[in-house]
Amino acid sequence: MAVGAAAVTEVGDTASPVGSSGASGGAIASGSVARVGTATAVTALCGYAVIYLAARNLAPNGFSVFGVFWGAFGLVTGAANGLLQETTREVRSLGYLDVSADGRRTHPLRVSGMVGLGSLVVIAGSSPLWSGRVFAEARWLSVALLSIGLAGFCLHATLLGMLAGTNRWTQYGALMVADAVIRVVVAAATFVIGWQLVGFIWATVAGSVAWLIMLMTSPPTRAAARLMTPGATATFLRGAAHSIIAAGASAILVMGFPVLLKLTSNELGAQGGVVILAVTLTRAPLLVPLTAMQGNLIAHFVDERTERIRALIAPAALIGGVGAVGMLAAGVVGPWIMRVAFGSEYQSSSALLAWLTAAAVAIAMLTLTGAAAVAAALHRAYSLGWVGATVGSGLLLLLPLSLETRTVVALLCGPLVGIGVHLVALARTDE
């Protein structure tokens, strides 16, 4: 006997509708976008605050060490965002599918807990092989916090996906803000008491407990956390694995780029600290809100499943417009902002900042086409696009050019490979 898929089974409860608005209820409607947009703005400001405090408190040499850990945590949690993407797709798609009433069910939050525990073991167990190359200082503390922080973030990302899939955008935004505020509070305390590098490493991972705080304080969040989706755990994990691989590849370019830069350079030093800060500042205005709105975008593309290429046009135009303004602003006032905000040691050229902003537009476009591919369940194409972009960027970083030039070339040209892969796959589904 088939039942309407909008009836999602909760753990230990009867069927419950997918969100208060139903599956079709406005993933990019003004209300949901406003709530997530506000949360994104707060999150971005908090992220800037942490980076500002670290850059002001640490010299460029020290900031390059912090930047690598910040990037390493961004890399592994970016991969864990594959759980957010797959959970959003699974929950959201229920409004368009019929499922067997007698079929097996999967509890995404429990599965993500197992994934997080497994990730902790893998990172900690393998750390003797790679941590010495990546972490120049506070090596074992960095490994411990990276492992534990990732385990918590797996649950965080899955809970975000369940909230996005059920249109609980207020709670979605609150979870984002809780994560960001916890980070900036720890960073501010570090700045005041002079905890230096170790304190900023703690601040990077401190927000990984936000999911637990939300579960303890928010009944709607607890209701979403109890949801189960149709299908076996193995089926969910297969889809999540593709998303995690692709999200991991995307995280290398988006958050983990300092790690890639470190691995392809003999020594970063003060120049590396300046480049890492420049990359972070130029991409954040585009990529922070875009990454935060992954749930909205995937839900939107699921709703527009018959014309996904056309559905890309409006957000792509918005990204292009914002990017053009950003390039101009970065070239005109960027060097001055870096000197005034972070100190005279952080000297950067107008051309570098403008080109890095253009590179951020390329990665933003790749993020957008990737969200459309996830919504279409094109997991292989999604993975291939991001992996291709990452491999391309990594190879370009090996060119015998200056650090600034090869950084721009890698971040600008590598994403074009992935965009092409995604668009070809999406075009075939629309035929």
Curated annotation (Swiss-Prot):
Membrane topology listed for this record? Multi-pass membrane protein
Q: Which family does the UniProt entry place this protein in?
A: To M.tuberculosis Rv1510 and M.bovis Mb3654.
The record's annotation in InterPro entries points to: Poly_Biosynth_Transport
Disulfide bond entries: none
Where is this gene product found? Cell membrane
Protein keywords: Cell membrane, Membrane, Transmembrane, Transmembrane helix
Q: What is its main location?
A: membrane
The protein, known as: Uncharacterized protein MT3732
Q: Which GO terms describe its cellular component?
A: plasma membrane
The organism of origin for this protein: Mycobacterium tuberculosis (strain CDC 1551 / Oshkosh)
- List membrane-spanning regions: 33-53, 63-83, 111-131, 143-163, 175-195, 197-217, 241-261, 273-293, 318-338, 358-378, 381-401, 407-427
PANTHER family from the UniProt entry: O-ANTIGEN TRANSPORTER-RELATED, PST FAMILY PREDICTED COLANIC ACID TRANSPORTER
